[in-house]
Curated annotation (Swiss-Prot):
Any one Gene Ontology molecular-function term assigned to this protein's record: protein folding chaperone
Keyword Manganese (UniProt): no
Function: Redox regulated molecular chaperone. Protects both thermally unfolding and oxidatively damaged proteins from irreversible aggregation. Plays an important role in the bacterial defense system toward oxidative stress.
Keyword tags: Chaperone, Cytoplasm, Disulfide bond, Redox-active center, Zinc
Post-translational modification: Under oxidizing conditions two disulfide bonds are formed involving the reactive cysteines. Under reducing conditions zinc is bound to the reactive cysteines and the protein is inactive.
Keyword NADP recorded: no
A Pfam family recorded for this sequence: HSP33
Name recorded for this polypeptide: 33 kDa chaperonin
Organism whose genome encodes this protein: Brevibacillus brevis (strain 47 / JCM 6285 / NBRC 100599)
Lineage: Bacteria, Bacillati, Bacillota, Bacilli, Bacillales
Listed PANTHER family: 33 KDA CHAPERONIN
Disulfide cysteine pairs (residue numbers): 236-238, 269-272
GO cellular component: cytoplasm
Length: 290
């Protein structure tokens, strides 16, 4: 089973919901950036939520997320679009702590609690939408729950988890869900959701046991109606062609100076950790086309 997410409604349309399996995408991120366990959990949770937020968009809309809590992990950056494509990285991927008192990876210690969650949405308008909310726990899921309420005025519940193999650092399971109450939701529906959430196992455990996003929503919603199914992939917008265009945009004089002084160029994409190297011969070929 590959990565995918679903969009659904429940409780007679009073709740909209998103659920995702992101195991392969988070593992791809971990491998590309050589992340240590706690960093993987923090960035993987953020990537999972960002992908589900992408499912709230349409067409060519996209969003950018930044989590900056003042912890040793530094910033977590993530991007996603409406088509299930997302990517994420952290400032310092080599962060790992012992398990916390709940027996879980100590994500809060890595992220920190002195900072904000920032969300920027490109909705095709003149100016992008920008929202933010203080970090309340550093556990990511709780922080985005608070963000939705404070910045987007949408009562929400966010559950997210990443299970990492302690021996080889590989990602065993990753996924999450977002529940959002629509206006005028009856109190009995709110009470029913709260009760079900209180009985729900950890998301990473459910994914690890083979539960699908549909089965996870079955546990928290009353006969959910599936509206869409979108495949997910860890996908970056960088490419060799874009790098060449960036080099061309330097102008002929600056390119000649680069060849003369350095004789080579390397461009590093922070999101996917890809490196594009151009030796003197390659740069001279680009110069000929300018």
């Amino acid at each position: 089973m590959g990565d995918y997410m679903i969009r659904a409604t429940g409780f007679n349309g009073h709740v909209r919901a998103f659920a995702a399996r992101t195991t392969e995408s988070v593992e791809d991120m971990r491998r590309r950036h050589d992340m240590w366990n706690t960093a993987t959990a923090a960035a993987g949770r953020t990537l999972t939520i960002t992908l589900m937020m992408g499912a709230m968009l349409k067409g060519n809309e996209s969003l950018h997320v930044k989590v900056k809590g003042g912890g040793p992990i530094g910033q977590i950056m993530a991007e996603a679009n409406a088509h299930g494509e997302g990517i994420a990285y952290v400032s310092n991927p080599h962060v790992h702590f012992e398990l916390n008192d709940k027996g879980k990876l100590d994500v809060a210690r890595a992220v920190g609690t002195d900072g904000f969650v920032y969300v920027t949405k490109d909705l095709g308008l003149k100016e992008p939408y920008q929202g933010s909310a203080p970090i309340v726990s550093g556990e990511i899921g709780e922080d985005f729950t608070y963000y939705f309420v404070m910045s987007e005025q949408t009562p929400s519940a966010v559950g997210v988890g990443v299970l990492v193999n302690p021996e080889d650092r590989s990602v065993l399971a990753a996924g999450g869900f977002i529940l959002q109450l629509l206006p005028n939701t009856p109190e009995e529906v709110v009470a029913a959701i709260e009760e079900r959430l209180g009985q729900l196992p950890q998301v990473s455990r459910m994914i690890g046991e083979g539960l699908t996003p549909e089965e996870i929503l079955d546990r928290v919603l009353d006969e959910p109606k599936i509206l869409s199914h979108t495949e997910i992939q860890f996908s970056c917008k960088c490419s060799a062609d874009k790098v060449v265009q960036a080099l061309i945009s330097m102008g002929r004089e600056e390119m000649e100076g680069l060849i003369e002084e350095q004789g080579e160029a390397e461009v590093h994409c922070h999101f996917c950790n890809e490196r594009y190297h151009y030796d003197r011969s390659a740069l001279e070929d680009i110069l000929k086309d300018m």
